[in-house]
């Protein structure tokens, strides 16, 4: 009778301890999600360097003040090569030409695919700077607005560079889910072992 009572009591304790196990399993099955990657930026002039020189034959047609009425066949072939690689490389080519001091008619450059009767649509380059201009437009000097810079505007990069919010936030990490599951199991397990040992000692002393 006493042995059966002891066995029933031990089985009851073991069954109650099994209720804690799913909590640990649920905590362990929820790993931290990886952050979503930022979208890739558009192609730069260095990415388009393999095809950007295909437009060299178009310089005579695209130059500011050019008298040519239509692009040459070699120019159309080069434009088609650039469009097949990446249409945005035309924009990169206009910017690169401006950086080298070559003034091009950006409006005519974007209309060249249509003039060459190509089926690929030209890109939307927006406002082209760095020397690529339309007829009658003069390039804007980058130093023109320098004297109007206020002292507060000059100090703003230093203030943003010393801000701790953007640099220190990524270093904060959330606690591992597995460690919380271990803490949940440790206290009930020790309690069960203590109760079992105490019960066996009590029943053994009572039977003697």
From Swiss-Prot:
Which cysteines are disulphide-bonded?
A: 48-91, 58-75, 76-116, 89-125
Instruction: Report whether Lipoprotein shows up as a keyword of the record.
Output: yes
Could you name the domain of life of the organism this protein comes from? Eukaryota
Tissue specificity, in the record's words, reads: Confined to the anthers and stamen of the inflorescence, especially in pollen.
Region forming the signal peptide: 1-25
GO cellular component terms? plasma membrane; side of membrane
Propeptide per record: which residue ranges? 180-208
Q: What is its main location?
A: membrane
Where do the segments described as Disordered lie? Answer: 136-181
Q: What SUPFAM superfamilies does the record tag this protein with?
A: Bifunctional inhibitor/lipid-transfer protein/seed storage 2S albumin
Residues with glycosylation annotation? 27, 67, 105
How does the UniProt record describe the way this protein sits in the membrane?
Lipid-anchor; GPI-anchor
Q: Name one GO molecular function term.
A: lipid binding
Q: Where is the lipid attached (GPI-anchor amidated serine)?
A: 179
Tell me, what does this protein do in biology? Lipid transfer protein involved in seed and ovule maturation and development, probably by regulating the fatty acids homeostasis during suberin and sporopollenin biosynthesis or deposition.
Record protein name field: Non-specific lipid transfer protein GPI-anchored 4
* Organism of this sequence: Arabidopsis thaliana
């Amino acid at each position: 009778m006493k042995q059966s009572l002891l066995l029933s009591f031990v089985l009851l304790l073991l069954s109650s301890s099994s209720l804690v196990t799913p909590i640990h399993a649920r905590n362990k099955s929820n790993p931290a999600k990886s952050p979503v990657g930022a979208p890739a930026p558009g192609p730069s002039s260095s990415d388009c360097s393999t095809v950007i020189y295909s437009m060299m034959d178009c310089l005579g047609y695209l130059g500011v003040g050019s008298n040519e009425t239509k692009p040459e066949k070699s120019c159309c072939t080069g434009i088609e090569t650039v469009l097949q690689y990446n249409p945005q490389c035309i924009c990169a080519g206009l910017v690169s030409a401006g950086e080298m001091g070559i003034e091009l008619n950006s409006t005519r450059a974007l209309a060249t695919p249509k003039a060459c009767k190509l089926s690929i649509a030209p890109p939307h380059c927006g406002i082209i700077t760095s020397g690529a201009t339309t007829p009658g437009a003069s390039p804007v000097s980058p130093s023109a607005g320098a004297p109007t810079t206020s002292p507060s505007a000059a100090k703003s990069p230093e203030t943003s560079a010393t801000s701790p919010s953007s640099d220190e936030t990524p270093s904060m990490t959330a606690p591992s889910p597995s460690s919380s599951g271990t803490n949940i199991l440790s206290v009930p397990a020790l309690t069960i072992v203590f109760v079992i040992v105490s019960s066996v000692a009590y029943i053994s002393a009572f039977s003697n």
